[in-house]
Amino acid sequence: ISGPLRIVGPRSTFQPVLWRLIDEFCGQYPGIVPEIQLEDRVGNWVEDRVDVGFRLGLSPHEGVIARRLFAVQLIICAAPDYLRARGAPGSVAALQSHRCSVFRNPGTGQIVPWRLKSGNDEVQQPVVPAICTNDEMLELNAVLAGRVLGQLAGLTAAPYIRAKQLVPLLVDHIPDRYS
């Protein structure tokens, strides 16, 4: 197998895992030349001649063959500085009195509601935004700086949680998956 392999995916969510996958694949197939486009907009994969695409959520276009690879959890996180200054929310209702980030989907322009587990159900939880952005890395940096709480993709948050730069909050309300 040789030749170009056109790969697309969201810029920030998949960066922590994508390189390892590409590196391993190209190690097995050295004739492959990966052409990687990381961006948060969802283009037309057929017109763009995409071979492999990664996305969170539903298939971006009718006629695209999609497979669920893995579930992504959404985790409410805060930096230790935020918690020292403002404390941790003790309940979902307490989120209303905290500074929260919200993410605006770059493809639709809509604010993505926070998703939380309530019993056996998943609910959308409105929060009062202290910052709104369409860039996951900017949102991550605002959370790391201790300015806001954020609901971040587990792939994004995990290395910072392990390094104790972020603290997961309301863990009983983490939805089972966002995929």
Give residue ranges: language-model regions.
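Central regulatory/effector-binding core of bacterial HTH transcription factors
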Residues: 2-65
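C-terminal regulatory
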Residues: 44-47, 59-179
